[in-house]
A protein has these predicted regions:
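Core catalytic ATP-binding domain of two-component histidine kinases
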Residues: 1-144
């Protein structure tokens, strides 16, 4: 499972920053995707969540990841409790060179590349929403 492997790869980052990752998988289907590209998407999302939690000094940090199937698609939901993205800029976060990071550690390319990988290389869709706790990314990928 690529999500589990990616989260294992990032376990040091999560441990270092006291982030609990909850993962619920309701799918056993396989996808025809570029594995390394999808792994990069999950790394981008996890790193952004971690950075936001640190910058906003969030306590009891968590990332919830769930997968499920619906209508011949695999859905991956990636949610954090980092307080969300300001309404003024949420529509711009997939734009190239756009970054919300105040410390200038962001290039503004991570989410742009993630959207390109999901939508142009994998035939899927990625959307972002604010929740009561933070931000939720929903990725939809076609099942083979």
């Amino acid at each position: 499972n690529i999500i589990k492997k990616t989260m294992d790869f990032l376990s040091y980052l999560f441990k270092l920053n006291s982030i609990t990752v909850n993962y619920h998988n309701s799918s056993n289907s396989s996808l025809e995707i570029y594995l390394n590209e999808i792994v990069q998407v999950f790394i981008n999302l996890a790193k952004n969540s971690s950075d936001a939690m640190i910058e906003k000094n969030i306590e009891n940090r968590f990332i919830n990841i769930s997968t499920y199937e619906k209508n011949d698609s695999l859905f991956i939901e990636f949610e954090d409790n980092a307080g969300g993205i300001k309404d003024l800029v949420i529509s711009k976060i997939f734009d190239p060179y756009f970054s919300t990071k105040s410390n200038k550690n962001g290039t503004g390319l991570g989410l742009y590349m993630s959207k390109t990988i999901i939508e142009e290389h994998s035939g899927g869709k990625i959307n972002v929403y604010n929740t009561d706790f933070g931000t939720k990314f929903v990725i939809k990928l076609p099942l083979k």
